[in-house]
Amino acid sequence: MDGRCLHNIMYTGTYDEIMRAINIYEHRNYSSFRNLPLHYAIYSRRKDIVETLLKSGYDPNSVDITDNNCLQLLSMPFDITMLPVDEEVQDYAISFYLSKNMKHTSMLIPITKEALRGNRYPSEPYFSSMCRKFKDNELCIMDLLLRYGALPNSRKDGLLPLYHAAAAGNTEMVELLLSYGAKTNLHTRYEDSIFMCAIKSNNVKTAKIISDLYNYKNDINNILKTIQLYNADMLLFLIEIGLDINTKDKKGKTALHYACNSINCIETVKEIMKYGADINVKDREGLTPLHSACKYGDLKLSKLLIEYGADVKVKTTSTVLNLAVESGNVELVKFLIEKNPEFITSDYLSLSLAIRCKDINIVLLLLDAGMDVNSSKCISTPLHLGVILGNSNIVKLLLDHGANINAIDKYGETPLEAANKRINIDYAELYKSNRFIIKYLVFLSRYDYKIKNNIGFIKNMYIIDKDETLSCFRNMCETELDKISSIKIGQYSLYSLLASDNDVKEYICKNRQEITQKIIDNLKDIIIYRSFIEKYISRINI
């Protein structure tokens, strides 16, 4: 008999069938994996078989092929794929287990056995009795192993049995291991203490047993970092044993900071606030919990924190709006601006960040809210950034909102000049951005004669003149503008209407429909400046 057959029969066979299988295995494979029958019996929770094998000399401290000893096999999370059943039964067992909100994964064994018997919907009293018997059976197996000499503090790999039991919130198993001398001052490979394992289980009874033997203050940093894992009862327990909810770790962060760093933390935050958490506490970087919420783009959490009194105007290395912009949550950005309209005039960095993130929706939101499209408080203007970072759609958007194409940055370069000096750039996007800029440049030069004396304009024209492709497109723009200027709309040219419709408002108001139709009739050969004209038509017909 091979190991797989022996494993399967442990779950389905009678005592006699299993012992016959073990006898066959011992005669054929005993020298290779001497204690394998004991490991299988433990993992399948066959107390009767475990007791028989221990009496016959099987080693309670032996390890299996995964380097786990007998106590570890009994206390570690159960792997349902070890059960000799098909996927349909496995899926049922997992679904039923989750529906009961159970914490001990080994309960999958009796659930599966009941399913194989055809009892997939046991009554509540029957199910409760079944669980109680199974749990008692597990404890009896552990007691047998310990009485036959299993060492509670021994391991070759993995977690100690006490840590597995504490992490599962298995209070009875924890008590049994402690009674046999299990140590509480060791740590896991992840530096978790026994106390951390216990509180993560959210079983207050288990945590209390460990806390009586261990100083929780040794784990204060880890407790804060994992605060989002604890339910209301566990949080109350931590407060009762002395945890100050405003305690800071080495980074200056509190429990509220860490809670706001995680997803689905609304309820945790509400619980923390019950115990007097400082809503505007700053860490060593000057960041508040609201900064954390905005960093992860959590609109619901941000609203909750502000309801509790979080200061949206708090000054630090980054504003909450900066972080919200980087998160990409348009609704959060909109909400913060509504809460603090001063962001529009004081937070010049957010527009640059939105451009860096290439988030056209947030760029549009900030521009429509009134943020300065020509802000020069950074090294470069927003238009410089848009061109250099290679996003022609954002470049067009900035130009449509009045970006100054002749602006000079701190290095003395215009957007066109700066972008065309770059080597590491998306040339397809640069090509489109160049055309947008030249289109606006040529249009402006037609009606603003003073612009020709502007140093930025001179620089731009120099860049265009020395590049054959750019010069060619400029000439195309000039030709199309000549055509637009030749189109007569009443006593005005179409170009004069586009360039200065404020001067002819009365004429436009009286002849709106006629003007619109006349323009539409002449759109056929207009390509480069078609968007200008369509925008003009929309504007006069509002």
From Swiss-Prot:
Superkingdom classification of source: Viruses
ANK repeat feature ranges: 33-62, 157-186, 218-247, 251-281, 285-314, 316-345, 347-375, 378-407
Keywords (A to Z) from UniProt: ANK repeat, Repeat
Coiled-coil residue spans: none
Claim: Nucleotide-binding is one of the keywords in the record: no
InterPro entries to which the protein is assigned, alphabetical: Ankyrin_rpt, Ankyrin_rpt-contain_sf
UniProt entry tagged with the keyword Disulfide bond: no
UniProt cross-references to PANTHER family, sorted A to Z: ANKYRIN REPEAT AND PROTEIN KINASE DOMAIN-CONTAINING PROTEIN, ANKYRIN REPEAT-CONTAINING PROTEIN-RELATED
Protein name, per record: Putative ankyrin repeat protein FPV115
